[in-house]
A protein has these predicted regions:
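Short, functionally critical alpha-helical segments immediately adjacent to catalytic or ligand/cofactor-binding
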Residues: 73-90, 97, 120-124, 148-153, ...
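N-terminal carbohydrate-binding/catalytic regions of secreted carbohydrate-active enzymes
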Residues: 60-67, 78, 82
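Flexible domain-boundary/linker segments
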Residues: 80, 84, 99, 140-141, ...
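Non-catalytic cell-wall polysaccharide-engagement segments
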Residues: 2-57, 106-121, 125, 129-204
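Short, charged helix-capping/linker segments at alpha-helix termini
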Residues: 67-76, 137
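Glycine- and aromatic-rich loop/turn segments at beta-sheet edges
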Residues: 91-100, 170
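Short linear capping/connector segments at secondary-structure termini
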Residues: 45, 82, 96-103, 107
């Protein structure tokens, strides 16, 4: 083999090694081409961790049970963060979901659910709907997760409205939706316009 061919092979080997190293470094990232542009995306399946009170962690077996039942078991840490924001694991309606349409056992009025397990089942069932409507691809899909979380707080009608208006959640459109609902219902307040960030402070 002549010297030029040996050098060419070495350069090829170096390029392969460098390329493999770059791929290893970017790990869970990849790229796809859509609408004429290159877009980057994460491996959305990787869950984070929740930093919550022991009162919330005491419900982890039930959270895991119902998250699995409704096909969102990878979101257990998110649900724990959600419960931390809603109730810190205290009281009976730990998911604060008594007004949800899945509550068919008790009055759909604030705080009417007297059974923590039923609250967990109902809240997780509803959150699963919110995730589906938001098109959330996994617990690492933070942009769509924010949309689903705001939908849990406002009601799922917000999700479709926000997608049509802005393509997803923004604090500005959450405020606009809240103002619109206050006017329609004649209420002083409507929901928490920064609910996603209030939940996600417990989720990393």
């Amino acid at each position: 083999m002549n010297k030029q061919k040996i050098m060419a092979n070495r350069r090829r080997d170096i390029i392969i090694i460098v390329g493999c190293t770059i791929l290893a470094l970017i790990g869970g990232y990849g790229w796809s081409r859509g609408f004429g542009n290159f877009t980057w995306f994460r491996n959305f399946d990787t869950p984070g961790t929740a930093s919550v009170d022991d009162a919330v962690l005491n419900y982890e077996p039930l959270i895991q049970q119902y998250a699995k039942e409704y096909g969102i078991e990878s979101y257990v840490p998110v649900i724990e963060a959600l419960m931390q924001q809603e109730s810190s694991g205290l009281g009976a309606d730990v998911m604060q979901c008594s007004e949800c349409y899945y509550n068919t056992e008790y009055d759909q009025t604030p705080g009417s659910i007297p059974d923590p397990e039923y609250s967990i089942q109902t809240g997780i069932h509803y959150f699963a709907d919110c995730l589906e409507l938001a098109g959330c691809k996994g617990p690492g899909d933070i942009r769509r997760l924010r949309l689903a979380l705001q939908g849990y707080n406002f009601g799922h009608n917000y999700i479709e409205w926000a997608i049509k208006r802005d393509g997803g959640y923004t604090e500005a459109n959450a405020q606009a939706f809240s103002d619109m609902m206050k006017e329609q219902l004649g209420w002083e307040t409507y929901g928490d316009t920064t609910y996603p960030e209030h939940v996600l402070r417990y989720y990393k």
